[in-house]
Amino acid sequence: MSTYTFVLFCLQICLIQNVYSQCLGRVGPGGPPVGPYGGPLGGPGYGPVGYGGCGGYGGSGIGNVAVAGELPVAGSSAVMGQVPVIGAVEFAGPACAVGSVSISGACGPTCGCGGSPYY
C-alpha cells in the first residue's frame, strides 16, 4: 500500500467517525440503560474523570458570526434537508431592509432530546 493510499484511508476513517459520532444524544451508544457507563470511554471532559457520564463532544456548540458593513444582498435562499445548526439571528442598529426572516428547527428523533419544533 502506498503512502498516499494510506493517508486517504486514514482521512476516510476520520470522516466516517465524525459523521457517525454526532447525534448519539445523552444516552450514549448502548441505549438508555447502559448509556452513562459509556461516557467515560470518550475521555475526560472536565477534570480528572468523565463529565457527568458524557463524552468529550456531543455534536453541539456555540458559535458567533459577526458581519459589519454594507451588505447589498438580493434574492432568496432555501435550505432543505438536515442542517446541523442551532442558533439565533440578531439585528442591531439601523437596517433599511424589506423582506422577512424565518428560522425554524427541531431536534431529530435520534438526538435524544425529544424537543418539538420551535419557530
UniProtKB/Swiss-Prot annotation:
Region of interest (Right arm), residue spans: 104-119
Biological processes annotated in GO: chorion-containing eggshell formation
Region of interest (Left arm), ranges: 22-55
N-terminal signal peptide: 1-21
Entry-linked InterPro entries: Chorion
Pfam families noted in UniProt: Chorion_1
UniProt keywords, alphabetically: Repeat, Signal
Central domain: annotated segments: 56-103
Free-text function comment from the UniProt entry: This protein is one of many from the eggshell of the silk moth.
Family membership noted in the UniProt record: Belongs to the chorion protein family.
Listed name of the protein: Chorion class CA protein ERA.5
Provenance organism: Bombyx mori
Organism lineage string: Eukaryota, Metazoa, Ecdysozoa, Arthropoda, Hexapoda
